[in-house]
Design a protein with these regions (language model features):
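Membrane-embedded alpha-helical bundles that constitute the cytochrome b-like, heme-associated redox core
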Residues: 1-137
Length: 137
């Protein structure tokens, strides 16, 4: 049985990851619709880093919750596996963005764009799966 103290951490996990999703969406909207402004790239970078930091903070809360309740057993279920994938993607995507700015390679730009789209899509799917887990309690 999961202790009440562990369950009490769930809102922090949800808040941090969902905030990260909203911040990343703002960064994507900035890149898509505000390119005519001089400040769009700085805003896009700032929002991307802030969104990744918030998301990773929320994932760290989840890792603590799982390790405190299940020990060293790896998490099971689609929500956990997508969460692991998202944690990798929110590091990979900004990294590719910074590299593509230095190299000016269109292939890297496409990888950065698609990685961002996939990351946001996975986060939306995982938010739904997380909500289904919470509803089952």
């Amino acid at each position: 049985m999961i202790s009440d103290k562990i369950i009490m951490l769930y809102p922090f996990h949800a808040f941090l990851v969902f905030s990260g999703l909203l911040i990343l969406l703002a960064g994507m909207i900035c890149a898509r619709y505000l390119k005519g402004r001089r400040w769009w790239l700085k805003a896009h970078k700032t929002l991307g880093i802030a969104g990744a930091a918030s998301t990773l903070s929320g994932i760290m809360v989840a890792v603590y919750m799982v390790s405190a309740s299940a020990g060293l057993n790896p998490p099971a279920g689609l929500h956990a596996y997508i969460g692991i994938t998202v944690s990798i993607m929110v590091i990979f995507t900004p990294f590719m963005g910074f590299i593509q700015l230095k190299k000016r390679d269109m292939r890297l730009r496409a990888i950065h764009r698609w990685a961002g789209r996939i990351t946001i899509a996975l986060m939306i799917i995982n938010a739904y799966l997380g909500w289904m887990i919470v509803r089952s309690f």
